[in-house]
């Protein structure tokens, strides 16, 4: 009887170890790739000028979210949210800034649900939701959290169920799971960090980007986080260098030898994109290929003027600033063919990564 129990325990332990190993997911080795011309690896499908919402035009995009055939453009200078179709057509304004219940004030983050039907806005006072088809206000909620004003990024799982990110956790988790007045830590870390992007949907799966000094992407499942993707760099920030407070963060931020963090990420069915703050305090791009397990890694070229903002099943999307595109860029001919030099409005770029196999 004792022998049988012992064998059962061994089997359970083995199964548990197998399950944990499976949760490690993909690892992309970025130490052997050094892309110096992204034009050799990117196929442009479309490059479309965005229609102006009015005579004031468009300012710089602080953030864009894409889903359900639509894009929300957060105009930082105008403090407004505009809805577009993914062919560049202006669809309307979403909400407005103000003091009423239906208006946002001091936007911190925006998040689109997995179906692309509802936009959520995190502002100084709570979480608002808007219908993507009409742009009309739907609801407002303020999670019952101490120090709610310290949360800067969020994701929506369902009504009253959110993940929230605090860059200065003061002993609590950087990422918490809040559901109808109750919450728990999902990721415990005492490091001071940037309020970079933290959450995005890939299909029906909610993805959670790692904290400052780490380089992985988790998925949220069954009330916890499971490792989905890990990126390997030749010069990751050492554990002892991770900033514990604002002063040490300022010092580490000035050091030029290390990869610091993942600033943003998105996915297609095959490819995983990450925007990484690398050495020399410069941004680098990673495109990891699920099919081959290989990664493309290289410096983001500022002369291309392209910012990757999202993905769907087959393609990535980016916002192109025509005035930043140099004559050496692979995008210059698209700009000349698609827009007026007298009125350089932002452009929506749809592209694929070329197969490397």
Where are each of the predicted segments found?
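Residue-level detector of Asp-centered blade-edge/turn motifs that repeat once per structural unit
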Residues: 66-68, 112-115, 156-159, 201-203, ...
